């Protein structure tokens, strides 16, 4: 048995060869490979996705270690997408992984050629950039899935999937909807979101991110390193909220699950497959 076949033998056992071939042909792009996007990327590669583009402008910070897949004490200061790509290729060396150290904005949107992809995954934190991606992605023929806020959560049983306009109890979704209404710009079609209606409060001390006490890449690379230009993102956040790995990972896994189930729905004879969109929407509604 070839190594490539052996890697995905257990997946093929469940889904069948035709479904695995379908998965391998899909092209996916993920925007944001932090606490949610990094786990989504690994799950997709382990599930058989071979054509994956990962987009993030940031470098690994020591405060990422508690929740981001590629963040370790050895990767602090490295470009996130490069560190993640290296890990993904150890899982499937034949995968075609494109790592883009870029940020998605209204100004850079044309650089990503979204029309080339079958699936677009949104794991962006910035409200403005997230809104811009949603509007553009919904103009393409690609399937689009989005993550709402994963911070200030503890209970994994409250994580769910529903259509964007049906999301309840999530401040990020509320802010996005208000922005769309205020600017009178709306997504051209409905799309599924992963979210939680839980909202806790920060119980610890104020974060030092972006201050002189910050332990981000400058602590390892030195204050003269040009990569610190990207560190502005940390200090520009209005508020730093607490996050936990088990929550962000579940968000990422559920996004990956939406891709895999959508890609295999028309092929697999296993009843549970393909039912997630309808079932979760009904529960949330």
Q: What are the roles of these predicted feature ranges?
A:
Residues 30-32, 55:
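Conserved N-terminal Rossmann-fold NAD(P)-binding element of oxidoreductases
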Residues 2, 115-119, 124-129, 143-144, ...:
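Glycine-rich phosphate/adenylate-binding loop
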Residues 63-70, 153-163:
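Acidic/polar active-site rim loop that often engages polyanionic ligands
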Residues 101-109:
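Conserved SAM/SAH-binding loop
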Residues 1-29:
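N-terminal charged helix/coil linker that caps or initiates catalytic domains
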Residues 36:
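Hydrophobic/small residue at the entry helix of a nucleotide-binding pocket
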């Amino acid at each position: 048995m070839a190594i490539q076949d052996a890697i995905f033998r257990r997946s093929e056992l469940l889904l069948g060869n035709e479904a695995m071939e379908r998965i391998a042909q899909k092209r996916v792009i993920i925007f944001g490979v932090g606490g949610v996007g990094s786990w989504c990327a690994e799950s997709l590669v382990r599930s058989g996705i071979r054509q994956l583009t990962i987009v993030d402008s940031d470098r690994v910070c020591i405060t990422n270690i508690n929740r981001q897949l590629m963040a370790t004490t050895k990767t602090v200061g490295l470009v996130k997408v490069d560190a993640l790509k290296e890990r993904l290729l150890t899982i499937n060396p034949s995968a075609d992984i494109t790592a883009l150290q870029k940020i998605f904005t209204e100004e850079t949107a044309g650089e990503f050629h979204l029309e080339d992809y079958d699936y677009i995954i949104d794991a962006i934190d910035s409200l403005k950039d997230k809104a811009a991606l949603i509007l553009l992605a919904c103009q393409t023929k690609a399937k689009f899935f989005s993550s709402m806020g994963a911070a200030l959560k503890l209970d994994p049983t409250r994580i769910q999937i529903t259509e964007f306009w049906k999301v309840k109890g999530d401040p990020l979704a509320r802010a996005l909807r208000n922005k769309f209404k205020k600017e009178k710009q709306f997504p051209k079609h409905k799309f599924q979101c992963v979210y939680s209606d839980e909202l806790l409060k920060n119980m610890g001390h104020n974060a030092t991110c972006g201050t002189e006490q910050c332990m981000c890449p400058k602590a390892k690379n030195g204050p003269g390193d040009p990569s610190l230009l990207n560190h502005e993102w940390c200090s520009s956040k209005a508020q730093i909220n607490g996050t936990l790995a088990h929550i962000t990972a579940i968000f990422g896994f559920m996004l990956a699950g939406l891709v895999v189930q959508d890609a295999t729905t028309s092929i697999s004879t296993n009843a549970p497959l393909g039912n997630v969109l309808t079932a979760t929407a009904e529960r949330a509604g």
